[in-house]
Amino acid sequence: MSADLAMGPELPTSPLALEYVNDFDLMKFEVKKEAMAAHDRANIRQCNRLQPQGSVSSTPISTPCSSVPSSPSFSPTEQKNHLEELYWMPSGAYPQQIDPQTLSLTPEDAVEALIGATAHGHPPPPHVQQQLQAGAFDGYRGAHHHHGHAQQQQQQQPQHHHHQHQYGAIPHHPDDLSGHPGAHGHHPHHHHHHHHSQDPDSPSPTSPEQLHHRHHHHHHPHGHPGQQGHHGVGGGLNVEDRFSDDQLVTMSVRELNRHLRGFTKDEVIRLKQKRRTLKNRGYAQSCRFKRVQQKHLLENEKTQLINQVEQLKQEINRLARERDAYKLKCEKLTGANGFREAGSTSDNPSSPEFFM
């Protein structure tokens, strides 16, 4: 774009406005013109035809000619010399203001993309400029869609606190610059952790799928213990062989359910049936033991009672023999007197027969 267009009769006399317009004079910047010179001149002529007469904006406001939003225009009908209108370029939300449908590449687009490089006094080589011109603004299409997602991932991983979102399409990591030949040593002040702000359409060799795989690679060992046990079962270890009979019987239901996470439903049902069988067997053995113990107690008591009965029988026999002895002795004593009166002595309380 020529300098005559930037200097019009309606240019305001404010020094700040003049400095603002002169900062965007495109004649100061070097743009590669071998392959795209004719295309750039055609776009410039088309943009000049669409430029309104009352505007002195350095960038055309027609969106098919440029994907960069137009700067605040200075027309005599609207005198808005607010400072916030002049500071639209350094704002962090610059990539979000771009129309995602405009894909035309103009010298203005290339200059705006290379502002970050020329600001440090290290202009890139011409072939790097061509690569940046070809792929830089393709990433601007989804920049405002992925800006919130990058901020959310930045909050989730606070170790990437060096994240900066200046230009989503310009790679700042030294690994990302490996895809561009001759680009090492470029941007020494922007080698930050830029893993999570890469756009899906960015020409960087590090794709979001690789970043996603790299992110999940660190969290892979934190799987569920039941799932690891399930992989162990597939390695030849049966679910019934993982626990002994004593462990199944003594283990609580909550602990058993925690160990059975990751197994199939059939294996869980089979193991619980085995546990129920073992518990029933334990209950039966306990009842049998109690019955045997009670039987032993009863048998011991019976033996004691039998012994007591034998002792009582022996006592009865002894008393019977003693009785017979006393009876014979009494008969001998009565027979020695020589007379016996029938029934006379039986009624006498003093006779021995009275007690028999």
UniProtKB/Swiss-Prot annotation:
Q: Might you name a Gene Ontology BP term for this protein?
A: ionocyte differentiation
GO MF terms held by the record: DNA-binding transcription factor activity, RNA polymerase II-specific; RNA polymerase II cis-regulatory region sequence-specific DNA binding
> Which Gene Ontology terms of cellular component type are present?
nucleus
Assembly description: Homodimer or heterodimer with other bHLH-Zip transcription factors. Binds DNA as a homodimer or a heterodimer.
Q: Tell me what gene encodes this.
A: mafb
- Which stretches of sequence are listed as region Disordered? 49-79, 140-240
Give the organism the record lists.
Danio rerio (Zebrafish)
Where does this one sit in the cell? Nucleus
The entry's protein name is Transcription factor MafB
Stretch list, region Basic motif: 270-295
**Region annotation (Leucine-zipper) ranges:** 298-319
Q: Cite the record's Low complexity compositional bias ranges.
A: 55-77
Q: Which Pfam families match?
A: bZIP_Maf, Maf_N
Please state every residue range assigned to the domain named bZIP.
Answer: 270-333
